[in-house]
Regions:
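Membrane-proximal intracellular helices of multi-pass ion channels
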Residues: 1-181
């Protein structure tokens, strides 16, 4: 038990260091990089600004946050297995399969809804950008945002809110940082 705890701690420290470096390389100030590395990896979702990640208006920062949220919401027992070189176990894990299936379905549905709603001027890439971030944040129960909450409730309406709500309810798995199930 002591050995396993130590390994998970080292993995977490390593992910944190890499996350800080990636946020910094994406253009985030160092202090903010440290803060968001911790909050995205732990899927805590705390933000330093009211606008959350949207404050930076930076697609690279959003991409880093997406990757870090997914890593943080992945079963940490699998991290060790993957780092030992056993990638097959990652793809065999039922929680991982379900999470990726929900993620892809959610992204597809929200992207189509946003594109068809003309809220983003029928801009497909912008619709994908916002849907991927919000869907990942909802499914991992992180709560970081690239779209203000009032904009989601007032403009996204219907299907977008429904999909995000379902994903938040389903949330992360038992061995994730979120410990929802």
């Amino acid at each position: 038990m002591k050995f396993t705890t130590r390994i998970i701690l080292y993995i977490y420290i390593g992910y944190t260091a890499v996350s800080i470096a990636l946020f910094k390389m994406a253009g985030m100030p160092l202090f903010d990089s440290v803060f968001y590395a911790f909050t995205a990896l732990s899927t805590g979702g705390f933000a330093m600004q009211n606008a959350s990640i949207a404050f930076y208006h930076n697609a690279w920062i959003e991409l880093v946050a997406i990757i870090v949220m997914i890593i943080g919401a992945t079963n940490f027992a699998l991290h060790y297995t993957v780092l030992k070189g056993n990638w097959k176990e990652y793809f065999k894990d039922i929680e991982t399969k379900v999470a990726w299936t929900l993620l892809l379905i959610g992204i597809f549905l929200v992207t189509i809804f946003l594109y068809n709603s003309s809220y983003y001027g029928h801009n497909f890439l912008l619709s994908i950008r916002y849907s991927v971030f919000q869907v990942v944040s909802a499914l991992t129960t992180t709560g970081l945002q690239t779209v203000p909450g009032n904009e989601i409730t007032l403009q996204w309406e219907g299907m977008g809110i429904f999909v995000l709500t379902i994903l938040m309810i389903v949330g992360a798995g038992a061995c994730y940082n979120s410990n929802i199930l």
